[in-house]
């Protein structure tokens, strides 16, 4: 049994009692990375020297019994800036970017005394659902190396599933934590928009992006969200909501829970194996005293279209800062200022990023703004209202995290429309801004299936309670890929 088979709480107790040291945990991480990283490719940059340095310091000082995450190894998605540690957003344009400050979540993790093992691979600028658009390399799913780990936080999910780190941070703009968590058989939480500071997150779509934790089990996830949540003066969209002790909500008692299951989430297009795993999960929850009814989120059908217009529009604005003048890649082939802009961006951005910038710029252009951007915003309002309506009568909404299990590498990369439409079950949650968690709920043809539990605004504690109660009745989270 490896050290990462233990939970956060178990490892914390061992550290406090000095049965193990932070150095042991960091060694476990790098030994595992040495043995499997060539196969999975979870990381872009490793932080080996600094990680061992922090581990030695913490070992010498002793672990604070009140600091649950102290001495534990974490991986951080490479769109979250880390001071003096290369941060690339998996793009050529930021290949050698060395930030001069830490993101708020990174500062919070340092205060919690976690140890950063390195920066995790992702789709370039978080644009993708497969971690195939990274400038550096593709990440492979630990359960089947011929398949994708999901995206855009594919490295964050694969590193946890492969046992390279104990837990990780990802970001979720349209499903980028939940879908890879589902594909890799781990737990991923997208918090309520504004629950976690975005300061230091390299922006894709500012009204949709949210940072969240990826872990092996629900309890670990709750501890990590406690550490990174809270109001931040540096992020005007962060919300002044008390940081709850999410870990206190894991009582296992969900008697009387009212579940809404949207008919749109189990409709045509959802793999039969995925649908069956979700129905079996609902039976498990019924045994625990919950009830469920079929409900409708009637405007879900507009989710993907409105999401791709809005997210691409925001991206075209956000990514205009990468111009070759201030930081990042600068084309050596430019002779005029105009050439500097066009060549830097043409050479520095990958195809998918360029596709979305063009789509967004088109949607925002004067002749098309009303027809596309404005209409997408109206659809977003209707989607948000759908959730509000269901939550008047139900505590949580449940469905699959993805309509399929992990697909083959190179299987969809040249078919963007199919890839985009695969986000149908996750993007409405970002458009509405509500929280959702993906937990392992079974297997289909040997590949993990994720159960998506969606809550009302700031109801993360309830999501953890439901997810934990389900997890206690099953063993899916204990299954490990055979690498």
Curated annotation (Swiss-Prot):
Self-association state and partner proteins as the record states: Heterotrimer of A, B and C subunits.
Family note: Belongs to the amidase family. GatA subfamily.
A matching Pfam family: Amidase
Swiss-Prot/TrEMBL GO biological process terms: translation
Superkingdom assignment: Bacteria
HAMAP family linked to this entry: GatA
Its EC number(s): 6.3.5.7
GO molecular function: ATP binding; glutaminyl-tRNA synthase (glutamine-hydrolyzing) activity
GO annotations of cellular component type: glutamyl-tRNA(Gln) amidotransferase complex
Name of protein: Glutamyl-tRNA(Gln) amidotransferase subunit A
Enzyme kind, highest EC tier: ligase
Function: Allows the formation of correctly charged Gln-tRNA(Gln) through the transamidation of misacylated Glu-tRNA(Gln) in organisms which lack glutaminyl-tRNA synthetase. The reaction takes place in the presence of glutamine and ATP through an activated gamma-phospho-Glu-tRNA(Gln).
Taxonomic placement: Bacteria, Bacillati, Bacillota, Bacilli, Bacillales
Annotated active site: 77 (charge relay system), 152 (charge relay system), 176 (acyl-ester intermediate)
Record keywords: ATP-binding, Ligase, Nucleotide-binding, Protein biosynthesis
Catalytic reactions of this protein: L-glutamyl-tRNA(Gln) + L-glutamine + ATP + H2O = L-glutaminyl-tRNA(Gln) + L-glutamate + ADP + phosphate + H(+)
InterPro entries xrefs: Amidase, Amidase_CS, Amidase_dom, AS_sf, GatA
